[in-house]
């Protein structure tokens, strides 16, 4: 496995209309590593994802994905191609409520979803199983699915095209407390089997304990990312 960090952020600053700009002093994500970061609200989390993917550039600092700076990509076509390396699991991703869950899962593979081609249907079933979605949901309208199934649908679509880096925005925000740890286990299993690096922007400690190798908290005033203190009693 390469020793080049999957994601590296150094001295990053980006203003976005909040009381303070988004600052990240230093973050290095090893290949295959999973990290949670608490301390970013929904707007800051979206900005973080945009910075990592190069959709937005920082006013200061450097962001590198697999050794390459996002600032080095100046061509729109090249940038679009670079997005293949990212999977983004977010509630901002549109689910077609009137379509079946299978049709929603088929969309990353093409727009021909009525009917779903046999080969694509097989890939959809395998993807659902991998992400912890019971197969009986596939023929049901997506709008009828519970929050846990929808969260796993966002996860499944994010990994469908084999990205190298998975970004999750508050993935358990809509989940019942009883499902948060299991979702963390499901997401960790998916990342492990695919050798995915991942950053989850979440303050959910139960999810983080099941999902992450490291859990960090952003200090907004300085941009420091701190780990929980050890307790000796």
Model-derived features: where do they sit?
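Helix-to-loop junction immediately C-terminal to a conserved catalytic motif
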Residues: 53
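Conserved ABC transporter NBD signature motif
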Residues: 61-72
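ABC ATPase NBD coupling module
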Residues: 70-87
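Q-loop/switch helix immediately C-terminal to the Walker
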Residues: 92, 98-113, 123
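Conserved ABC ATPase "signature" region
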Residues: 119-137
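Conserved ABC ATPase signature
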Residues: 141-146
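Hydrophobic anchor residue at the start of the ABC signature
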Residues: 155
């Amino acid at each position: 496995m390469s020793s080049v960090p999957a994601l590296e952020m150094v001295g990053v600053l980006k203003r976005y209309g909040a009381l303070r700009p988004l600052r990240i002093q230093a973050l290095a994500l090893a290949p295959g590593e999973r990290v949670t970061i608490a301390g970013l609200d929904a707007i800051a989390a979206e900005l973080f994802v945009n910075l990592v993917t190069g959709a937005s550039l920082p006013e200061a600092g450097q962001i590198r994905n697999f050794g390459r700076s996002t600032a080095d990509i100046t061509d729109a076509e090249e940038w679009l191609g670079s997005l293949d390396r990212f999977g983004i699991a977010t509630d901002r991703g549109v689910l077609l409520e009137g379509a079946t869950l299978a049709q929603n899962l088929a969309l990353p593979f093409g727009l021909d979803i009525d009917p779903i081609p046999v080969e694509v249907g097989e890939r959809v079933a395998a993807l659902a199983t991998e992400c912890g979605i019971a197969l009986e949901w596939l023929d049901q309208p997506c709008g009828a699915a519970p929050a846990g199934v929808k969260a796993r649908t966002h996860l499944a679509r994010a990994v469908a095209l084999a990205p190298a880096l998975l970004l999750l925005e508050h993935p358990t925000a809509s989940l019942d407390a009883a499902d948060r740890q299991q979702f963390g286990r499901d997401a960790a299993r998916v990342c492990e089997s695919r050798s995915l690096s991942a950053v989850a922007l979440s303050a959910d400690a139960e999810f983080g304990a099941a999902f992450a190798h490291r859990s960090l908290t952003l200090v907004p005033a300085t941009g420091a990312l701190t780990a929980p203190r050890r307790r000796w009693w």
